Structure formats: C-alpha cells, structure tokens
C-alpha cells in the first residue's frame, strides 16, 4: 500500500522533536546503503529530502558482426566465431526488473556459436507434422448402387478427384520444396525426396448369399439325370408316365413299345427310384401331419389345464367361505347352549358330534362317541 502523501495545509515537522528527526534520517540512509551494497531491489519510499537525479548514460553502441555466408558448402565446417555478443555493459547492469512485487529476470545473451551448435530438427519429424495421424479412413465402395447413402458419388468423379488431388499435391511439393540452411547430414539426406503413401483401395465386400438347401438341388439333379438318361437311351415316353402310372397302365405302356433289355432296365430303375421318392415324400407328409396334430393336442391340453386350475381356485374359495360360515354357526350354537346351572359351554372344551341317525350330541373334547346303527 503506498504511503499517504502529505497534506499541504498541515506541517509534519512540528509533530516530532528535532533530535528524533535527525536520528530517523541517519537510520534511513544506513538502510539504503546496505540495500545498495547487497544488490537488492527494494521499493523505496520517498524520503524527507529530494534525491539528486541520475545522469543519462547515453545510447548503447551497436554491435558489429563479421561477414559470413548463410549457405556454407556441404563439406565445409564453420569455424567458431571470433567474437560473441556483449553479455553486459557498464551502464546497464543485468539486474532483474521489478514491477511492483514481481521480479522478471533478464535472459542470457544469445551467441552465434550457440545457435550453430544447437541441433536441427529431424526432417522426418517435420514431414510428419503435415501428415494425418492414424490410419486413413477407408473410402466407401464407389460402385455401390445404394441411393440411400449420403456420400454416394460416381466412380468416374472419384477417379477425377483422386487425380486432381494427386496433381495438386505434386505441384505443392514442387513449389515449396523442403530445404534447410545448414546441412549437418550427408548429401543423401540433405535434400530428401519423400513419396506420399499410396491410397488404399477400398475393400469390396461381396454380399454372402443365403443358405442353399442341398436336397432340392439333388432332387432337380436326379430328375434331370433321369431325363438325360432316358433321352440317351431313346425311351419313347416321358419319365412322368414311368413314375406316376399305376401298375396295370404301366404294364400296358411297356407292351405297346418294343424295348430292349437295357431300356427296360433303365425304365424299371427310373420307376423304382421315383416310387421311393414318392414314398419318402408321403412319409414326410405324414410325419408333418402327425407333428401338427400333436401341437394342436398340446394346445388343447394346455387350455384344459388352465380351465381346471381356474375351477380349482374357485372351489378353494368356496370351501373357505363355507368353513367361515361353519365356524360362525358353531360359535352361535355354543352361545345358545346352557348347562343345568345356566352357564354356557366353551367351544374349546366341548365339541358337537353327529350320530348316524342324524342326532347331534355335545361331548367333551378327546372322547369319541360310539357309532350307533
């Protein structure tokens, strides 16, 4: 906090004695001399006497540099510089500047030898700055005929864009080559030629067809094989008649045409395998019908079970109601029963039992009444 400035209408000197004022000035001068010797930068407060202004030292002399080439030869090593930048001047001491309570130190002077000895960045690392990190994003199939894709484009336009982008990249490399002022590497690495990685071709995923049933294909092959064999053997009637005709009609058909032994053997083989095929189809049909009937019977039994469960629940509820009514009637009867003294019977000590003839008796608990015919 800065000290309060003195007011013009008030005199501060008469407030302190003359002896104490002189001692304070001497003490203050000693403190200032100690801080100057130690090189400390302590914010000073205005003293009672004004200080003399310090003379202006004048501008600093500009440094001079020796002429040197910026681009030295590849096989020439630069000698150390004959001089360095002046580290400090007598007129401007290297003390940290103070702004309030913050001290800012002065950086060390830079020298030309330090700049030359500093390692240059790796050219491969500089090239990686402009390249994208990670694997390139795979492009979509240009031959896709899906009209729902938002990134849909023709294959020809993609090829034109690819060639245009490659041409622009090559022109950019030609216009802005990578050069370095100091070649501290061999001549092969002084001017490297970098080739861009080839663009990955999009993977075309073929749509897998659904599962193909083997049995229908076998049946079709068998039918076509029988037809081919019949045509090769010059059978005069189609294979459908051979398989589907009854026995009598089939025998009459064979009697109408004069056939050789090989033709008869082929016809009988075709009929046998066709009948086996029809029998297998009928067997599968009967199995499917049986499965359907069993499913229907199972559904019927499930619905019947649910109906019986509902009926059992209703019977249990009815039985519970009857038990409650019987208990109420039991207590009501015991309330009306009296002994010879006029006292009521306790239902915990006596029970009501009915005989075979319908008579009701009041007996103590634990005793059994003999059944009377």
From Swiss-Prot:
Q: One MF term in GO for this entry?
A: sequence-specific double-stranded DNA binding
Q: Where is this cross-link: Glycyl lysine isopeptide (Lys-Gly) (interchain with G-Cter in SUMO)?
A: 368
Q: Matching Gene3D superfamilies, A to Z? A: Transcription factor, Skn-1-like, DNA-binding domain (1.10.880.10)
The chain residues annotated with the modification Phosphoserine are 157, 170
PTM summary from the entry reads: Phosphorylated on serine residues. In undifferentiated erythrocytes, phosphorylated by MAPK8 which then leads to ubiquitination and protein degradation.
Basic motif, as annotated region:
268-287
User: Which portions of the sequence form the region Transactivation domain?
Assistant: 1-206
Superkingdom assignment: Eukaryota
Q: Give every bZIP domain span.
A: 266-329
Q: How does it assemble?
A: Homodimer; can bind DNA as a homodimer. Erythroid transcription activator nuclear factor erythroid-derived 2 (NF-E2), composed of a heterodimer of NFE2 and MAFK, possesses transactivation activity on beta-globin. Also forms high affinity heterodimer with MAFG; the interaction promotes erythropoiesis. Interacts (via the PXY motif 1) with ITCH (via the WW 1 domain); the interaction promotes 'Lys63'-linked ubiquitination of NFE2, translocates it to the cytoplasm and inhibits its transactivation activity.
Annotated protein name in UniProt = Transcription factor NF-E2 45 kDa subunit
Q: Which gene encodes it?
A: Nfe2
């Amino acid at each position: 906090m800065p000290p309060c400035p003195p007011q013009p209408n008030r005199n501060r000197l008469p407030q302190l004695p003359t002896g104490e004022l002189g001692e304070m000035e001497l003490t203050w001068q000693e403190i200032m001399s100690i801080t100057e010797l130690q090189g400390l930068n302590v914010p000073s407060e205005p003293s009672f006497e004004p200080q003399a202004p310090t003379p202006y030292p004048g501008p600093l002399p500009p440094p001079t540099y020796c002429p040197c080439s910026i681009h030295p030869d590849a096989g020439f090593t630069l000698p150390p510089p004959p001089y360095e930048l002046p580290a400090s001047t007598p007129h401007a001491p290297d003390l940290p500047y103070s702004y309030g309570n913050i001290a800012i130190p002065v950086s060390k002077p830079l020298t030309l030898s330090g700049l030359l000895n500093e390692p240059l960045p790796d050219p491969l690392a500089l090239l990686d700055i402009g390249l994208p990190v990670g694997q390139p994003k795979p492009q979509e199939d240009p031959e896709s005929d899906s009209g729902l894709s938002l990134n849909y484009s023709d294959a020809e336009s993609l090829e034109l864009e690819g060639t245009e982008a490659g041409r622009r990249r090559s022109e950019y490399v030609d216009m802005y080559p990578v050069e370095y002022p100091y070649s501290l590497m061999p001549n092969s690495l002084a001017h490297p030629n970098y080739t861009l990685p080839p663009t990955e071709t999009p993977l075309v995923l073929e749509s897998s067809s659904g599962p193909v049933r083997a049995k229908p294909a076998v049946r079709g092959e068998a039918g076509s094989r029988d037809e081919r064999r019949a045509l090769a053997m010059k059978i005069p009637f189609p294979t459908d008649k051979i398989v589907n005709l009854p026995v009598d009609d089939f025998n009459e058909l064979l009697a109408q045409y004069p056939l050789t032994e090989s033709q008869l053997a082929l016809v009988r083989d075709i009929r046998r395998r066709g009948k086996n095929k029809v029998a297998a189809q009928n067997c599968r049909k009967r199995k499917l019908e049986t499965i359907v009937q069993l499913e229907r019977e199972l559904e019927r039994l499930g619905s019947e079970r649910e109906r019986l469960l509902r009926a059992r629940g209703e019977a249990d509820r009815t039985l519970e109601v009857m038990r409650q009514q019987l208990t109420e009637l039991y207590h009501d009867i015991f309330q009306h029963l009296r002994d010879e003294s006029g006292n009521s019977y306790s239902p915990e000590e006596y029970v009501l039992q009915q005989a075979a003839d319908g008579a009701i008796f009041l007996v103590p608990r634990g005793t059994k009444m003999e059944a009377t015919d």
